[in-house]
Swiss-Prot record:
The gene is Amy-p. This is Alpha-amylase A. It comes from Drosophila yakuba (Fruit fly). SUPFAM superfamilies: (Trans)glycosidases, Glycosyl hydrolase domain. One of its GO terms (molecular function) is metal ion binding. Ca(2+) binds at residues 116, 165, 174, 208.
Amino acid sequence: MFLAKSIVCLALLAVANAQFDTNYASGRSGMVHLFEWKWDDIAAECENFLGPNGFAGVQVSPVNENAVKDSRPWWERYQPISYKLETRSGNEQQFASMVKRCNAVGVRTYVDVVFNHMAADGGTYGTGGSTASPSTKSFPGVPYSSLDFNPTCSINNYNDANQVRNCELVGLRDLNQGNSYVQDKVVEFLDHLIDLGVAGFRVDAAKHMWPADLAVIYGRLKTLNTDHGFNSGSKAYIVEEVIDMGGEAISKSEYTGLGAVTEFRHSDSIGKVFRGKDQLQYLTNWGTAWGFAASDRSLVFVDNHDNQRGHGAGGADVLTYKVPKQYKMASAFMLAHPFGTPRVMSSFSFSDTDQGPPTTDGHNIASPVFNSDNSCSGGWVCEHRWRQIYNMVAFRNAVGSDAIQNWWDNGSNQIAFSRGSRGFVAFNNDNYDLNSSLQTGLPAGTYCDVISGSKSGSSCTGKTVSVGSDGRASIYLGSSEDDGVLAIHVNAKL
């Protein structure tokens, strides 16, 4: 009996641990959030850019039918009408094709899933043609009725966990995930996505759902589809949106036993550092000492689709594409540092925080336009196509699991470190030049700085760094240069 219990416990532990695995293809790391992109465009991006540049995954916007709202704001995607795969990004056939094409080039798909709630009042018509009556909690496209929702109440006090989890977030009709029928419908929806070949989920508004209910839902999910290259028995990677800056009734620690969490403290802290409110020298103990969840439970980012607009957490400290020099430095640090599972943001430009993606006619999403230097236009920012970011994804892949070594700082805002003997980075956020002989940890030779340029054959389009037989190199980063970071690695050796 004891042996049987032990086996059951070990089996449960194996299942639990499996959902912390990103399911990335070997030798790849780092995902990108292609916010509001169309499925056909993502498929092409996987084949033409993400795959060749070593990206491991793509987070996509919600895939299921949402309410059509006036002026088509981005947040309409977070107001579900049904679980039909029909949105402005495309239909089920297009989504299935995208997942297959991305998997074929080693890029995994992670879906932003919304099942805390359904649409708020006014969301009577959906992108797939379904109708609903949010005011009476009737969503025939699922179908859900008033029996499937929590009683109507507002969230006014984040120190009351019951209110946060049982009441309505900004008027969105709050589903009761403890209801077995709701659980059935959610599992059916997620399992369908698993059948189509996705690798995991970002669970929207997880903080507003009871961990015990989520545990039931996650525990019922089928294993990943081996036809898409996943190992037998693999579980979906789960990352839960839990905004925990401290001082509230709900803690991320209630969720880290179930999956990874969106570590908003990382975003807030990295913004403060590279905006000059904290010194770079303090980054020497970056990680859990800063109040972050454990590395394998932390999805880390510089900004996300919410907090780049002032929603969520971080406020004015959050760095976005609108502060490009510091944004590139913070992104390079995140990708160079071994902590967490990094996610790169890929935005559309906005001046109004409600503004939706670029369209051709006010409704249909426009495709990004690509320039000769890899950057985007047509209203798309495409931070993932900035050389300083995509070359650091390659850096992360090159250094693998090698530890941080050879830490150096000037007691202020100049730092450098190596990742074992495979990569080296230096940062200058002071208002004077960095000019020092530093230990890179790398083998002797000439290396291409992958921030100022790229390795092209046996030459470099940017600066080069000469490493001596002792591993040292003269590192220069002028305070007025376009980039306050320099990076070299073994795959960029000339």
